[in-house]
């Protein structure tokens, strides 16, 4: 007979975030274009920070591509560094 999985110890809110995370890519090629503002904003929180890999579900290579695309888009003023409410 199988037992119920126990929630992660420590931060309870983190356990909920990890349980509800979606894998963005599973055997798919993910391409992040620095000009695609809508796609990049999915991976940025309301403070303007890049969401970490453990929440987004991206692989290390994909997260690295995302980070470079977000930083390049910020540099070219495609997306803001921070939102207006945090200025």
Curated annotation (Swiss-Prot):
Pfam families: Ribosomal_S18 (PF01084)
Keyword set, alphabetical order: Ribonucleoprotein, Ribosomal protein, RNA-binding, rRNA-binding
Gene3D superfamilies recorded: Ribosomal protein S18
Keyword RNA-binding: yes
Positions of region (Disordered): 1-21
InterPro entries, per the entry: Ribosomal_bS18, Ribosomal_bS18_sf
Stored SUPFAM superfamilies: Ribosomal protein S18
Domain of life: Bacteria
GO cellular component: cytosolic small ribosomal subunit
GO molecular function: small ribosomal subunit rRNA binding; structural constituent of ribosome
HAMAP family according to UniProt: Ribosomal_bS18 (MF_00270)
Quaternary assembly: Part of the 30S ribosomal subunit. Forms a tight heterodimer with protein bS6.
Recorded family membership: Belongs to the bacterial ribosomal protein bS18 family.
Function: Binds as a heterodimer with protein bS6 to the central domain of the 16S rRNA, where it helps stabilize the platform of the 30S subunit.
Protein name per its UniProtKB record: Small ribosomal subunit protein bS18
Species per Swiss-Prot/TrEMBL record: Chlorobium phaeobacteroides (strain DSM 266 / SMG 266 / 2430)
């Amino acid at each position: 007979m199988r037992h119920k999985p126990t929630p992660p110890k420590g931060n309870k809110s983190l356990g909920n975030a990890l349980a509800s995370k979606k894998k963005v890519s599973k055997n798919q090629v993910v391409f992040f274009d620095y000009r695609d503002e809508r796609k990049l904003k999915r991976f940025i929180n309301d403070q303007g920070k890049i969401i970490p890999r453990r929440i987004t579900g991206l692989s290390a290579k994909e997260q690295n591509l995302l980070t470079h695309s977000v930083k390049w888009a910020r540099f070219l003023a495609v997306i803001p560094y921070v939102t207006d409410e945090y200025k």
